[in-house]
Amino acid sequence: AFVTWTAEPRHDMHSFPGVLAAVAGVLLLTFACVRARVYDDRAAAVALGLGALPNLAVAGSGLLPLTDGDGIGRLQFLLACAVVLVAAVVLTLVSPRGDGPFVAFVCASAIGLFTVFAATVWRMEAVETAALCAPLAVGALAFLPGLAMRFARLPIGFASPHAARPTYGADLDPDADRAPQDPVDADRIAAQARRGHELLIGLVGGCALVSVGAAAVLGFSDDGWGQLLALATGVAMLMRAQLFRYTAQVAATLAAGLACLVLLGVGLCLNPSDSLMRDALNGDTAALDLRTIWLVAAIAAAAVLCTAVGLITSRSGVTPFWGRFLEIAEVFVLLTLV
């Protein structure tokens, strides 16, 4: 996928490289479906499916040719998200189990499709589109457990087999109004619970992918508010990890938060302002050195804080005071995203 994307200087995939990417994507998608449906080979299906999605995204961006004099834009990204969404849905439907990675791409491509469509309608820039994706991905995390249970069709709620009010003669025969109950299918409920767990992992992974992509755009921009939003997104993803209890879900959220902060740091290091670069080229590096000191101090403070939290909580846990403090801090960080 990377070779075909870089083969054309303008990234116009409405050409021979796009055809190669489409052929590779369709073949990998077909092999993934066969391994999942016929052979029940989860590992091979996931590997082949994840290999197919980037190629299909590259091929999807070339469904329409570029306008003369213009590069790749919102329309091409919209088509790429649509193709990835269709392919990920197909892979999810044909996979009998272990389709969490495909659900993640379904969620991420659906959010990308919605935001790029909004950016196309309202003529939004890349930073504005990323600023829309970041709060959407963070805010959606709170609704994912209930959404996963609905998709898995878990039996939610309880209907009493007895009447709400005893009828005439109930004191004589306590079992007079009791209807015969079917035996509980424990295996089916356990399978639905596992299905809900897999769906939740995929949905969390999709929101994590969107947040990391938005933080990459915001962190490498020259907009100060955008960089602050990338910082808030990373901190919010770290704090939102307390919503989940399973290791995979917590790890995905924590990894996304750390990736957002790392991308912000890399963007700040690689993209100093034009005025600082002009002064440095003229021999005046004082302002650039001061900026470097601030960046190093901030990175060191973040590393010390993460290390301290990991060492303290693994030994003694979180006290009620610090738990309440983290909840208040989480509310404050979420408000900054709005």
Region roles according to the model:
Residues 1-97, 106-117:
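Core alpha-helical transmembrane segments of integral membrane proteins
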Residues 5-11, 36-38, 62-68, 209-222, ...:
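Transmembrane helix-loop junctions in multi-pass membrane proteins
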Residues 23-27, 82-86, 103-116, 229-239, ...:
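Pore- and pathway-forming membrane helices of multi-pass small-molecule/ion transporters and channels
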Residues 41-52, 100-109, 249-259, 326-330:
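Cytoplasmic-side transmembrane-helix entry/capping segments in multi-pass membrane proteins
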Residues 56-68, 115-126, 262-280, 337-338:
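Hydrophobic alpha-helical transmembrane segments in multi-pass integral membrane proteins
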Residues 71-82, 96-105, 277, 284-299:
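Internal alpha-helical transmembrane segments of multi-pass membrane proteins
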Residues 79-253, 268, 272:
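Generic multipass alpha-helical transmembrane bundles of integral membrane proteins
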Residues 129-133, 196-204, 243-258, 265-338:
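C-terminal transmembrane helix-loop-helix hairpin of multi-pass membrane proteins
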